[in-house]
């Protein structure tokens, strides 16, 4: 008899329908998309809905935006992370200095020499914050900035694997965001991080008749009966909305290696 896999409902309209009833609980998944596709919005909405709809505390780890800028952007969608933080339901780790400070890195109260900074150092901060608030949902946005610092592909792969394994050990359902890297105009290659995560969500902008449309697609999701078809989505004043029963008349982008 096939064992039923526990699911984490996202709360995002339409997304649970194309992911077989939510994300596999306690797994690490990748949200892959172009700049402006709404990766950060989707990941933040996953945390916001987790707190308000399912009483699941959340942790956001930013490798790009400062806390101030991120909070200001999320308020536009009606997500009050500041109040949640005061109530102990949410925590923010600002790791954005890793790309701007040449001599040292400061993550929270921890200062690390740039030469000695490693993924494991950051993970110690993540573990500490996640434990402190009993985080059931964790977002790392965007992991691509960390990957880009490794010139050697084997080092990059090991770094991603270390990250995925450490996040899995927290027991939380985790989302990593990463930039979709194109090859030419119409194609792309599978990226290192895709092979190492439990599932992949693709967010793209594609030709839709005489205009452009947004599509979201489940690239893979282990232990899940998923909808592989690209589905349209919109970024509204309330966040991401997926339309699981609709399709676009678009020119398919080659997703093969």
Predicted regions and their residues:
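Conserved nucleotide-binding/hydrolysis micro-motifs of P-loop NTPases
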Residues: 64-68, 76, 96-100, 144-145, ...
């Amino acid at each position: 008899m096939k064992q039923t896999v526990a699911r984490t409902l996202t709360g995002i309209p339409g997304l649970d329908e194309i992911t077989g009833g939510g994300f596999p609980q306690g797994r690490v998944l990748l949200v892959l998309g172009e700049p402006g596709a709404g990766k950060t919005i989707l990941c933040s909405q996953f945390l916001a809905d987790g707190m308000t709809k399912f009483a699941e505390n959340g942790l956001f780890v930013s490798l790009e935006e400062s806390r101030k800028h991120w909070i200001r952007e999320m308020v536009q969608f009606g997500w009050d992370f500041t109040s949640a933080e005061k109530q102990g339901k949410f925590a923010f780790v600002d790791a954005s200095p890793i790309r701007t400070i040449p001599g040292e890195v400061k993550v929270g109260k921890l200062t690390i020499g740039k030469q000695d900074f490693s993924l494991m150092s950051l993970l110690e901060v993540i573990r500490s914050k996640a434990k402190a608030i009993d985080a059931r949902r964790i977002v790392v946005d965007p992991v691509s900035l960390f990957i880009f610092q490794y010139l050697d592909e084997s080092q990059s792969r090991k770094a991603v694997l270390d990250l995925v394994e450490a996040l899995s050990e927290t027991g939380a359902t985790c989302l990593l965001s990463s930039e979709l890297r194109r090859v030419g105009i119409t194609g792309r290659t599978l990226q290192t991080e895709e092979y190492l995560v439990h599932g992949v969500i693709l967010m793209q902008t594609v030709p839709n008749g005489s205009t452009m449309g947004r599509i979201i697609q489940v690239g893979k999701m282990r232990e899940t009966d998923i909808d592989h078809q690209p589905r349209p989505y919109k970024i509204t004043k309330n966040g991401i909305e997926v339309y699981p029963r609709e399709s676009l008349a678009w020119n398919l982008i080659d997703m093969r290696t």
